[in-house]
Amino acid sequence: MKHPYDFGISQDDFLVEEKALPINGGKLLCVASGGEVPLSLIAKHTMNIDAVDVSINQIRLCRLKVGAVQSLEPHESATFLGFSKKNEVCRTTYFEKVAKMLPKDDLEFWNRNISLITKGVIGNSRFEKYLLFFCRLFVSYIGKRKVLELVNMESVESQHVYFDKHIKKSLIKWIFRVVFSPALYGNRGLNAQGLIHQRGSLGTQFYLKFRDFFTSTPAKNNFYLQFYLLGHVVFEQALPPYLQQDFHESLLKNIKGLSFENRTIQDKVKHLDSLRYTNYALSNISDWMEKEEMDSLLTTIVKRTEV
């Protein structure tokens, strides 16, 4: 299977939803993607979440993560999923426990694609494989020592200074233009449908976000930075809440309020009856939809939102 699923990790930061939405005790409809947003929110808050995705394999990935946190300790789940350093023997052993939590069709899928399990499921999506390849080139170019020094910085101010002195180089901009050219990125890194509204240089846009990626949040708390540049999360404090020991008890208590469904948000909203939501997290679905379709969805959401 060339691309079993597009995203191993949600590209949306759950902190955005947590800060922007009045979520405690509410009902949220969101895009499932890699599962980090709904799983992290349910680990910290008592609420109801319905997470939907047009891809059945994204849903299978999310249910695998649910099975992992229900049957393993947090540090074991992190290793099993691929956040921690590679350990194929441990992952195979852990999968024997996780398998008992999976629906029959999901179990058959993962057994057919067992190499995804042994290699770590989060790093074997279309997007992650592409970006991790690019990041390995980047780290080889600037030196792993510099990345480790930055990851160990104690403040964002130090990260700013270090980035401008040691990492900001003209060749990096050229690399971004190549790696994120629509012809290459739209085939290997992302489904081309997600670029239908793209205007201007995608590589330049990514480059402008590049410095923020390194300097806008404390590196020790940024699991995206650590995972993409080093291939694993270095500091446990950076792991998503659903993989942290501090939230494990509340996660197990609240997870009954979380469901995953293979369905589009458009279809879910269209067929709402008595069930209404207090909050919606739509991710970047507008990138994949025509304007008229998105306008129709937003109009329907406004009419059917519980206030």
State where each predicted segment sits.
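Conserved alpha-helix/loop element of class I SAM-dependent methyltransferases that forms part
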Residues: 5-27, 36, 294-295
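A short acidic, Gly/Pro-enriched loop at the edge of an enzyme's catalytic core
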Residues: 23-25, 263-281
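Conserved beta-strand positions in the Rossmann-like core of class I SAM-dependent methyltransferases
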Residues: 29, 50
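Conserved SAM-binding loop of SAM-dependent methyltransferases across substrates and taxa
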Residues: 34-46
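Conserved acidic E/D residue at the C-terminus of a beta-strand in Rossmann-like folds
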Residues: 51-56
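Class I S-adenosyl-L-methionine-dependent methyltransferase module
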Residues: 57-249
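A short SAM/SAH-binding and catalytic strip from SAM-dependent methyltransferases
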Residues: 99-104, 277-292
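A short glycine-rich, Lys/Arg-flanked "PGG" loop and its adjoining helix->strand segment in the class I
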Residues: 293-307
